[in-house]
C-alpha cells in the first residue's frame, strides 16, 4: 500500500476499513473505481477505495475458508468449483453464471460488459489502469485475475493450507465477490441519493454494510 493509502487507512474507521491490512495484496485503485461505475456511481470521494478493498477481502476470506472445508471433506488438495458453490450455499449467497465478454451473465449483476458512467475521483496509477483494461478485454470481470489469485492464495496460506485453486473455482470466487461488491455499492448509492448528494463516500459504503449485516 502506498504512503497515501496508509494515510487514508489511518484516518478511516469502520468495519470494512479494518479488513485492509498493510502487507496483504489488495485490489488496484482502478478496480475500485470500475466497481463503483458498475454500480451506477458517477462520482465518488477518494476515500471509497478503502471500504471497497475491505469488503472484497472480507468476502473472499470467508468464501475461501468455507471452500477449504468443502475441499477437506472431499479429501482433495485442490479447491474445485463445486467447493466454491458449496461455500456460497453455506453463506446463503447466490451462485452466478461465469460471465464472458460477449455474453455477460444472465441472472447476475453482470448483464452488460460495457462500462458506463463518468470516472470516479482519482485516476489510480497508470499500471493499475492498464492492468484492469487488459483484464476486461477477455472477460466481464473487473479485478485483474492474477491479483485476485494472489489474494486467494494468501488467504489459504493464512488458514494453514497451501493448496491449488482450479481455474473454474477461481472464476466462480471472483464472480461471487464482484457481484456482492457491486450490490453493496448500489445500496450505498441509495444512501448517497437519499441524502441529496451525488458523491458516494466511504461512510455511505460502511453504512450500507451495517444496514445489511447489523451490528458486528
UniProtKB/Swiss-Prot annotation:
It comes from Melbournevirus. It is found in: Host nucleus; Host cytoplasm; Virion. One of its GO terms (molecular function) is structural constituent of chromatin. GO terms for biological process: chromosome condensation. This is Histone doublet H4-H3. Its main location: host cell. Residues 1-23 are annotated as: Disordered. Induction: Expression of viral histones begins 2-4 hpi and continues along the infectious cycle. The N-terminus is similar to eukaryotic H4, whereas the C-terminus is similar to eukaryotic H3. Residues 1-12 have a biased composition (Basic residues). Keywords: DNA condensation, Host cytoplasm, Host nucleus, Virion. Histone-like protein that is recruited to viral factories during viral replication and participates in viral DNA packaging and virion production probably by forming unstable nucleosome-like particles. May compact the viral DNA. GO terms for cellular component: host cell cytoplasm; host cell nucleus; virion component. Transmembrane segments: none annotated. It comes from the Viruses.
